[in-house]
């Protein structure tokens, strides 16, 4: 939304009418411009949900052509200005290797209040359940043993990782491979 003129038209009306609503915005942090920052400074209460599905190169793969350094810089700027900061995180086959690093990264930002996580089920091939159990289980175990996973902000994520860890369900690995080939072409 930070690049959409329509959002700024609405925010302009709010400012012109001297209103002070609580604003809630979700952003993938790829673009945080000066105009957006000025609006964040105006509102006394703001909830910003950072849509971030990985750490470092994993995020760059999932959100190509994004650059993690830019996303991290923008997330830090937003965290300093917003009154409430959360992360929306999608657990998927493409970030399961990166869970431990992601948990550590989130833990370093003291302003992040909560990680709202979901397990992806579509498109076909993206769920961690498409990965073989003997591959995914050690990765999930590593994340579940992370010293930070017991912090309140990770409650839902921990429940979902535990579910995946205990699951004996395995979907068609070829669906994951075929989808990956399609993604890698683009």
Residue ranges and their predicted role:
Residues 107-186:
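C-terminal accessory regions of radical SAM enzymes
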Residues 1-4, 15-34, 41-72, 84-93, ...:
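Core AdoMet radical
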Residues 36, 43, 55, 68, ...:
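Phenylalanine-focused residue identity feature
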Residues 4-7, 52, 68-71, 99, ...:
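A structural signal for well-ordered alpha-helical scaffolds and beta->alpha junctions
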Residues 17, 43, 74-85, 109, ...:
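A structural motif corresponding to the C-terminal end of an alpha-helix
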Residues 93-109:
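Catalytic cores of alpha/beta
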Residues 6-13, 35-39, 61, 77, ...:
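A short acidic, amphipathic alpha-helical/loop segment
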């Amino acid at each position: 939304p930070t690049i959409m003129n329509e959002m700024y038209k609405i925010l302009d009306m709010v400012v012109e009418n001297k209103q002070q609503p609580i604003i809630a915005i979700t952003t993938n942090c790829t673009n945080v411009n000066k105009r957006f920052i000025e609006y964040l400074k105006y509102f006394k209460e703001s909830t910003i949900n950072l849509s971030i599905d990985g750490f470092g190169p994993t995020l760059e793969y999932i959100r190509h052509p994004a650059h993690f350094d830019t996303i991290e810089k923008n997330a830090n700027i937003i965290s300093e200005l917003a009154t409430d900061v959360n992360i929306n995180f999608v657990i998927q086959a493409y970030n399961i290797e990166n869970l431990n690093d992601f948990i550590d990264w989130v833990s370093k930002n003291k302003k992040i209040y909560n990680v709202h996580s979901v397990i992806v089920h579509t498109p076909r091939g993206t769920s961690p359940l498409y990965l073989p159990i003997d591959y995914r289980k050690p990765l999930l175990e590593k994340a579940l043993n992370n010293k930070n996973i017991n912090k309140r902000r990770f409650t839902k994520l921990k429940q979902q990782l535990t579910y995946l860890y205990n699951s004996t369900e395995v979907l068609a690995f070829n669906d994951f491979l075929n989808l990956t080939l399609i993604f890698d072409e683009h």
